[in-house]
Amino acid sequence: MECPNCHKNASRVIDSRPSDENRAIRRRRECENCGFRFTTFERVERSPLLVIKNDGTREAFNRDKILHGVMMAAQKRPISSEQLDTLVDHVENEIRKQGLNEISSKDIGNLVMKELANLDDVAYIRFASIYRQFKDVSGFMEAMEDMMAKHDKE
């Protein structure tokens, strides 16, 4: 595997262990050229999944887009990157469980919001404000009321 430091193709595995609830293998590698250590992950290749965007176009599912969105929503919140990665895993697993080849971006957004609501209220509201494209304060207030109603039920 290519070293991210010196770009030589000479590395060796120095540690290997299950990761992501046994859905991946985490490998710690060391470059034989420069000694730089880095981590790689091995995951099962899954069948392609297409996302139907709001304008009707389709694109390949990209978990990194979801991760980026939740990272932005969780900025300066007490949420670890591991928690965000787990959230994205839950969303992706939920999508895959449905056995579909295509899913709308709206459905993905709803799954993300459901997961965020269980993780952090502020991150949920931040994500909702972009995902739902609030036009004014009333849309924001509706999201806040939804969150408060959820807490009242608990």
UniProtKB/Swiss-Prot annotation:
<keyword id="KW-0479">Metal-binding</keyword>
<keyword id="KW-0067">ATP-binding</keyword>
<dbReference type="Pfam" id="PF22811">
    <property type="entry name" value="Zn_ribbon_NrdR"/>
</dbReference>
<feature type="domain" description="ATP-cone">
    <location>
        <begin position="49"/>
        <end position="139"/>
    </location>
</feature>
<protein>
    <recommendedName>
        <fullName>Transcriptional repressor NrdR</fullName>
    </recommendedName>
</protein>
<dbReference type="InterPro" id="IPR003796">
    <property type="entry name" value="RNR_NrdR-like"/>
</dbReference>
<dbReference type="GO" id="GO:0008270">
    <property type="term" value="F:zinc ion binding"/>
</dbReference>
<dbReference type="GO" id="GO:0005524">
    <property type="term" value="F:ATP binding"/>
</dbReference>
<dbReference type="GO" id="GO:0045892">
    <property type="term" value="P:negative regulation of DNA-templated transcription"/>
</dbReference>
<feature type="region of interest" description="Disordered">
    <location>
        <begin position="1"/>
        <end position="22"/>
    </location>
</feature>
<dbReference type="InterPro" id="IPR005144">
    <property type="entry name" value="ATP-cone_dom"/>
</dbReference>
<comment type="function">
    <text>Negatively regulates transcription of bacterial ribonucleotide reductase nrd genes and operons by binding to NrdR-boxes.</text>
</comment>
<feature type="zinc finger region">
    <location>
        <begin position="3"/>
        <end position="34"/>
    </location>
</feature>
<keyword id="KW-0547">Nucleotide-binding</keyword>
<keyword id="KW-0805">Transcription regulation</keyword>
<keyword id="KW-0804">Transcription</keyword>
<keyword id="KW-0863">Zinc-finger</keyword>
<dbReference type="GO" id="GO:0003677">
    <property type="term" value="F:DNA binding"/>
</dbReference>
<keyword id="KW-0862">Zinc</keyword>
<dbReference type="InterPro" id="IPR055173">
    <property type="entry name" value="NrdR-like_N"/>
</dbReference>
<keyword id="KW-0678">Repressor</keyword>
<dbReference type="Pfam" id="PF03477">
    <property type="entry name" value="ATP-cone"/>
</dbReference>
<comment type="similarity">
    <text>Belongs to the NrdR family.</text>
</comment>
<keyword id="KW-0238">DNA-binding</keyword>
